[in-house]
Structures are given as C-alpha cells and as structure tokens.
Amino acid sequence: MSLQRIVRVSLEHPTSAVCVAGVETIVDIYGAVPEGTDMFEVYGTPGVDIYVSPSMERSRERADTRRWCFNKGLEIIVIMNSPSNDLNDSHVQIAYHSSREHLPLAYAVLYLTCVDITLDCDMNCADRQDRSFVDKRQWVWGPDGYGAILLVNCDRDNVDSNAQDNCDQYVRCLQDLEDMSVMVLRTQGPEALFEDHRLILHTSSCDAERARVFHVCGPEDSCESYKCVLGPDRMSYEVPRLKGYEERFFVEGLSFPDAGFPGLISFHVTLLDDSNEDFSETPIFTDTAVFRVAPWIMTPSTLPPLEVYVCRVRNNTCFVEAVEELARKAGCKLTICPQAENRNDRWIQDEMELGYVQAPHKTLPVVFDSPRNGELQGFPYKRILGLDFGYVTREPKDSSVSGLDSFGNLEVSPPVVANGKEYPLGRILIGGNLPGSRGRRVTQVVRNFLHAQKVQPLVELFVDWLAVGHVDEFLSFVPAPDGKGFRLLLASPGACFRLFQEKQKWGHGRSLLFEGVIGDRRVQTVSINQILNNQSLINFNKFAQSCIDWNREVLKRELGLAEGDIIDIPQLFKTEKRKAVAFFPDLVNMLVLGKHLGIPKPFGPIINGRCCLEEKVRSLLEPLGLHCTFIDDFTPYHMLHGEVHCGTNVRREPFAFKWWHMVP
C-alpha cells in the first residue's frame, strides 16, 4: 500500500479529492482555521469512516458526532472501503466552533471520490490471487511466508525458433504463456474520473532489464494480442482502460539470481491526477507487487530418475548397451547423443547439470551448460533446450576455465540437517583447493550463480589433489531405507588395503587385478602381493586417504553426518604428474537410478570365481535394498581418467518440497 495521503481543506470553497479504497487520507485542517476556534465537529456521509487522533500521544478514535478540542498535533483520518458510483458522491464536513459562540464559526467541506486500485498476483503461493492478508511490497520466505514467484522463461516453446522464448519482445506461441506469471490490474470507480486521471505501470531501470511484461490488448487466444509494455529500455507504460474493471498482464523473467541481483523484482502502478491544465501531474496513489525469480535447483542422485543421457562414441558400444539395460530396469527414458554430434566427446556429465525451476503454476526442467566447452558444447543448447525444457549457462569473460569447471565437480547432497539448520533441498558440493593455497578453483561466475540461488548453500571440498579434480571421483550418494534416507559413499584406500591384506592372509596373494580386460592396449596384470609390497603406492594412497579424510570431516560437519551415514568403498589411486588418478575403475563414480546402481567394473582379484572388490561392494550396498550392476568402462572411460558417472547424466524428479517454504 501507499503511504497516507494528505488533503488540505478550505473555508472559502468546497475541496474535492480522490481517495483509494482502504487507504488512509489525512485531512489537514490547520491551513484554514477561523479565529477563536477551540473545538470542532467532523462527520461524513455513509460509507466514509472518520477517525480523530487528538494528539501524537493518544491513539485514534472514531469521530462519531461529538465535539473535539482543537489541539496542536491532532489528525483527522478518513477511510473509504468501497468505490464510488459517481464523482464526488461522498463528503466530509468539518464544523469549527468556539466555546463562546452557540453557532459554528465556519464550515469546510471535502468531497470524495473513491476508487479501488490493486495490482494483484499470486501472493500466497497457492495458485490463487489473494491480497487480503499480505503486504505485496514484501517477499517472505518460509511455510508461513508469502510473495509472488516469477520463472525465467528460458525454454523454447516455439518450434520455429532457434532462440529461447525470452530473447525477444514477442509472444510467439500461446504455450509460452504457461511459463509466465499473471499480474492483474483491477480498477473500480466512476468512469468519468479516468478522463483526467492516468494509470501508469512502471518499474526501475534495473528491474526492467530482468523481466518483461506483456499487456493483453485483445483476444487471449491470439499471440498478436500480447503487447510488450515493460522490459529492457521500457520502464513505464500508460495503461489504457481497454476492459474497464480488469487489465491482465503476463510477466516473464529474463535473469536468474546472480551476483548483484538477489532475485527480487518490483512493479508499481501509480494513479496520476492530470486535471489541472496549469500544473504538472501529481501522484495520488501507488500500489506495488514484488516477485522473486525462482532459483535454479539441483537434484541429488537419491531422487527418482526420469531420463538418462549417454554419448555413443567409437569404442563404447557395449557400455551404451549396459546403460540402456540399466535404464530399462529403472523404468526411465534413455537419450543417446550420436557420435556425429559429440565428435567423440563422451563426458556428458562434465558438459551439463540437469535441474529445474518451479513456481506454483509450473515446474520447468532447466539444463545448466558448463563453461568447459568441449566437443559436446552445442548439445545442451541444440538438443535439450526446447519445449518446456529451459537452458542457462555462465562463462567467464576472459574464457579462462580449468578442469574444475566441468560439472563432474558439481554435485548436491540429499536433504540434511546440520548444526541445527535444515537444508530441505540439500547442499551443493563443489571442489576447490585448500584454504590459502594457490590451486585450482571453480570459476567465479559459476560460483556467483550457484551462491545466488540461495536454496542449496555451497560446500567447498578439497579436490586439487586429484588430476582431474572432480568431487565425483571420491564420493556419491545412494538411497537408503533407514536413517537419513541415504548413505554417503566415500572412496577409501584404507578399506582397499584392509581387504587385500585379508585376502593375502587367506592365501590369495597371487590373485591378479585386471584379468580379462579387453581393449586397444594390453593392460598389465598386478597381484595382491605386488600391491601390498609396493611402498611407493602405499605411501601415495596414505596421502590420498588423508585428503579424503579432510573432506570426510567437512562433509560430516556441513551435512550433519555421523559415521553410520558413511560407507567406505575400497579404492586405490596412483600418481600422475603429482596428482591422483584411479588405480582401478573408480567404484564410487557410479550411475544411481533409484535402487539400481551402474558401478564401474573394477577387474579386481578373482577369488573362488568372483571378483573380491565386487563382492565387497555388494556386501556393503545390497543390504540397503540396492541392486549392483558392474559395467565394463575400462577402455572407453577408465583409461581416459573417467568412469560410469562421468559418461552419463540423469534428469530426475523435482523435490516434493517447495523451495519457497524454506528459510535460507
């Protein structure tokens, strides 16, 4: 609502004023007071509520029909709650009295015309328009909060277009309107009032760059009826009275929250008095509606899968077939990027992250395109952006990116509670270097974007010890039927050495790793005895374990985890240019499709006809109701320093929890 309006009355002639339903009007009686006045009466026609505040120290009281002492600091407050039928059809009369005179000294008359003006939108996030209980100038988080929500219209509903829907000032297809939020300007009052009063819809120059408003100026089933009235370089619009009582607008977001933009956008409608030809217009009333741009939200691996993505390259036919079978078991769609489009870039996890945006009226999947820009660079924009599938990207202006800017280094935890604070949408995990070091970090534009979304606060882990440098090289999350509903899997050199020592103790020291590997290059086998006698390998894995232990403590602290929430998965690393790479296929770098896990086949020592690494992993995960499928990724992925998770991507169901119910 606007602030109170002040109207001054005159003893020489009646005064006319416009008031807005439900908005207080202060009547200034000090400018025209007969000499000798020490009391006054004030009364009005039916429908006019009048209050008197005798002084700054006393609360207001109904004026009723009694006389009031004329004191310094008193106020007369007038409120009308229903719009007028005609101009000046209500009035307030003030009678000035002297205690020494029987009759009033003078009268002042204020004629009132009441209009009802509201800028309405979905304020309570329940898919209905309601303005009865909230301050539209505010946006409040939480289950009892309120505020309008705006989607960035970043999909491509028009099949004849090559651009996102919000890239121009036109509505190209009616389906595009489903991605927008409705804003309604309602006006009630005498039609004659608007002959010399104007309604202006306006916003700030900054907000005009972040949202676009379309006015419905004709039949709603015609794209030509939607006129762009606010947006870049358009900050104000005189609203014509096309439909009288109600004018409808559709609002689309142009920008996600980011550095310097917290996500709030305000629109205002102002009633201007243009009745005096000798003076400029004067504002009477302003109503405001505030929208928050919906954040981009990541989905953890514990949410149900909807669609799996994989690249077909020269030497991964069996891998693609295995992923296809796993997707079939999990009941989700499979999308294969052909070699002609990926040009042998198989790292589809690194190229993009699949998330969503949500408003009460619409949920929209949105792909976040990484700045790595390999041969898969065009795939998210050309093949995923489309009907009801949005797109966003962030790239540094100087084009300087590192391996940490690939999205294998971008994960999100399931919902957690840590240090007394709830994170109902989990926390984003990114990899970086140690505090104070000069190693690699995620580029600032990506960090700024992720931080600005607010609903999944960042946790930075230490990954600069890894050659590739991705968080998915040493951790993953799987669903669990008990406890927190998930387990954190951590790669563990210590667990692997303990397993091999146990097998050696039972006489299996000569059992070989890498037997049966088929590929373009011969892979030399190595025995358990050789591994346990390789002091250089042991020392390097002690270093790797210390790095993982550092991250373990960070994860326990920042995600509120106990040791019982963590499962150690046997894994060894080897050194390459002073950094770590997986010694055998990295078991935690898995594809999680509900209860079905696609795990890199480790080609571990065969004992009693079975791989002891596979058997150990099964013993850890199958009691949780999970089904382990070991996929041979050795030649097409492992030998290139990646695994199953690196070579796949998953679109998942959104959270059931609504982001606007949380308190960041």
Swiss-Prot record:
GO terms for cellular component: cytoplasm; cytosol; nucleoplasm. Its cofactor is Ca(2+). The keyword Phosphoprotein does not apply. Keywords: Calcium, Cytoplasm, Hydrolase. Disruption phenotype: No visible phenotype. The skin of 7-week-old null mice appeared normal, but scanning electron microscopy revealed structural alterations in the whiskers and hair coat morphology. It catalyses: L-arginyl-[protein] + H2O = L-citrullyl-[protein] + NH4(+). GO terms for molecular function: calcium ion binding; identical protein binding; protein-arginine deiminase activity. Signal peptide: none annotated. It is found in: Cytoplasm. Epidermis and hair follicles. Its main location: cytoplasm. Belongs to the protein arginine deiminase family. PANTHER family: PEPTIDYLARGININE DEIMINASE, PROTEIN-ARGININE DEIMINASE TYPE-3. This is Protein-arginine deiminase type-3.
